[in-house]
Amino acid sequence: MTIFDNYEVWFVIGSQHLYGPKTLRQVTQHAEHVVKALNTEAKLPCKLVLKPLGTSPDEITAICRDANYDDRCAGLVVWLHTFSPAKMWINGLSILNKPLLQFHTQFNAALPWDSIDMDFMNLNQTAHGGREFGFIGARMRQQHAVVTGHWQDKEAHTRISAWMRQAVSKQDIRQLKVCRFGDNMREVAVTDGDKVAAQIKFGFSVNTWAVGDLVQVVNSISDGDINALIDEYESSYTLTPATRIHGDKRQNVREAARIELGIKRFLEQGGFHAFTTTFEDLHGLKQLPGLAVQRLMQQGYGFAGEGDWKTAALLRIMKVMSTGLQGGTSFMEDYTYHFEKGNDLVLGSHMLEVCPSIAVEEKPLLDVQHLGIGGKEDPARLIFNTQTGSAIVASLIDLGDRYRLLVNCIDTVKTPHDLPKLPVANALWKAQPDLPTASEAWILAGGAHHTVFSHALDLNDMRQFAEMHDIEIAVIDNDTHLPGFKDALRWNDMYYSLKH
């Protein structure tokens, strides 16, 4: 079972009574056929549920009102099968607070050249019915997605699936609770921000709990529970000699297991799905949570270090979006560079907390090494390299008057040399279009040093996320040129200042 099983998407057909009962029966039959086919053949993440035809203002308003109050409804897919006068939709769309996708399709793929008549034309009017619906959306400044294509087309299936993932993530974020163990790393700017504004804009709440509250739960974990989790470690990872039974760091592994179980219990009891820690606030914990955080991220929790609640929330959102897709998604940080003409590289990592969902190794290495930051005992961690291929890194920042999402398209590459003295998980990539352009654009746009790294999601996913939440997006990819990028930032400043 995945999070998508908790939701459904309503399929709504727009028409009108002008065409008579016979035509409306045909419309209903077509809709039933299309919904059944999409549910069985399109590999959609959510089930489509066909609703009654929308043929009058009252019917349409009732559907939209019911969608708002149904917790299982993640959004609406609307198909204008015939012409549906758009003034009928005004009241419904004005109250709708769920995501909306217009599926610009028609029942037949090919025109029946020899038999086409006006009955056929009146029945299959998506071509101009969809435009009428589009006008009222533009007139009302109603943000909605549009997918054009035949309902049997796999590209259309893919795009609807991607939108469904966004719709579900939007419902999840409205319920998201972020737990901060301690506060921000002292004097750091980008990890701070306006939590009230974030809750108003996105819906997620951010609150702080004392590390001492967590320590109480950690200390209550039984040896039996720890032993069971250690057995899972043994079967899932390659343990270094120091971490095996009778190894001199075995107790550190047991303590890491205790911390993992304690954090998870705390999060479950509080209904949290994202959290932060900071190495400056570890009072009562014997080590910085490393292995614990890595494993919890792999289970779908959002996380970021140093109290960075925005990145923790973004990671949770992107984890939900990417559920069931190939490739992983992780907390990440641009750590250091390799400058080589024509082969500039970024080495991404963090002190410990990189999610093993992006690991290339089937069984990452579990080790315990010294960590100079934090002043605690040596922490356990998983060490691995990252899968190669196209990926993105994304950052959500608070500019005071708005949120900006930065996305850099990257190409992850194989590490050309062993890293025998680097005891942390890492990712190596080439930034698009090149490191100088990408880094300068990122810096000019105010991008954070913390990011969410993903092989599973792409730029289109993040564009759709920004549109659905009505926030700014700044893209750095192979089409980026600094003069144009700077102009876009200036235009965005003007646009959002006028908008708000």
Swiss-Prot record:
GO molecular function: L-arabinose isomerase activity; manganese ion binding
Necessary cofactors: Mn(2+)
Pathway membership: Carbohydrate degradation; L-arabinose degradation via L-ribulose; D-xylulose 5-phosphate from L-arabinose (bacterial route): step 1/3
UniProt-listed Gene3D superfamilies: 3.40.50.10940
Catalytic function, reaction form: beta-L-arabinopyranose = L-ribulose
PANTHER family in alphabetical order: L-ARABINOSE ISOMERASE (PTHR38464:SF1)
Function: Catalyzes the conversion of L-arabinose to L-ribulose.
Family the UniProt entry places it in: Belongs to the arabinose isomerase family.
Quaternary data: Homohexamer.
Protein name: L-arabinose isomerase
Gene: araA
